[in-house]
Amino acid sequence: DETFAQTQPRLNMATFVTTYMDKYATQLMNEAIAINYIDETEYPRVAVMCAKCINIMANLWNSPEEGKWKTGALAIGSSEACMLGGVAAWLRWKERREAEGKPTDKPNFIISTGYQVVWEKFADLWQIEMRTVPLTLDKITLDPEAVIKLCDENTICVVPIQGVTWTGLNDDVEALDAALDAYNARTGHNIPIHVDAASGGFILPFINPDKKWDFRLKWVLSISTSGHKYGLVYPGLGWVVWKDKKYLPGKMSFSVNYLGADITQVGLNFSRPGAQVLGQYYQFIRLGFEGYRQVQHNSMEIARYLHSEIGKMAPFKNYSQDIVNPLFIWYMKEDYAKKAKWTLYDLQDKLKQSGWMVPAYTMPKDIEDSVVMRIVVRQGFSRDMADMLLGDIRAAITDFEKLEY
């Protein structure tokens, strides 16, 4: 009863998180809700399913690693997966510096100001300096040239993002890889790339498979993603995959024997739900590559439709001309905003009255004066629902323009 008046999950256009799975997947996860993944002795098949999921993602991202099993780890979400990728980069750097007899007290990593908050947590918790490259209205993704200017011998990694939370855009990992390759060759440093692909990791392989952003690139050593975003599984579930086992420091593996057998684990958390692993494995074998391609293609088509229609509305301008993920942002035209008696925050509140959650927010540092709105399209959001949302936006604008105060 207490949750009845809340926004219905499928009307929440703010979240990236999966809000729809078919009834069989839902039933499967409900029946597995008591499974603790870490109890591999009791649930050995769940561990095998997890390893198979890691193999599938590694292959999606063109892993060159040989052998039956690829190197990766399960996480509670993409935040833990990012942490694991970051810690691995830090430990590799630290071990190399110690072997060379050099100080290890001033590590740093580089990322754009469009980062997700987990990277701020990573910097604070591990006392690693976060160097940021500003996003601007002219440079709306990570600028490789600006990255190189921030690099030094203490840089543990650079973190490009595929599916920036603020904008929905992708950093150019291929250009960054080329810039880092030249820099590393010139300086003798070995600065790698960790790709934060929380959203894009499950979009690019199906929508733009020829684009090089993954393990095909020399300096990409690890990739993290979210299973509970475009991996199409209910929360919480994340994944991280390394290019090869040699890039996963041994210090990150912990063993216990008090669960009935020797169990080795890579992760910040110990207990974790097994139901999400079953959900991911179900989606992989139920949908297959073609099924995922169709789902993501449909989400992209609906997002493009909304992007086009909102761009035609008199008050608005889209942040980018095209979209590369099923999400986009827009802002109020400057000349319209000067005379308008309403703001995007008012539109957010108005749409909430109809059940929609379409967030309005300020952009990150250096362009924080810009207020935008964002729509995230996910599986379960239909063309009919898109038309309903557009109708409510148009009706809200009509009501606002009648205001006389």
Q: Where in this protein do the model-derived segments appear?
A:
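Short, conserved charged micro-motifs
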Residues: 336-347, 383-388
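A common structural junction motif
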Residues: 351-359, 394-401
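N-terminal entrance/gating region of PLP-dependent enzymes' catalytic architecture
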Residues: 1-70, 355-358, 373, 392-393
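Short Gly/Ser/Thr- and Asp/Glu-enriched loop/turn motifs at secondary-structure junctions
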Residues: 67-69, 104, 320-327, 368-370
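Conserved PLP-enzyme active-site core in the AAT-like
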Residues: 73-251, 259
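A generic structural motif
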Residues: 164, 286-289, 334-336, 377-383
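Active-site C-terminal subdomain of aminotransferase-like
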Residues: 206-325, 331-336
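PLP-dependent enzyme catalytic core of the Aspartate aminotransferase-like
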Residues: 183, 365-405
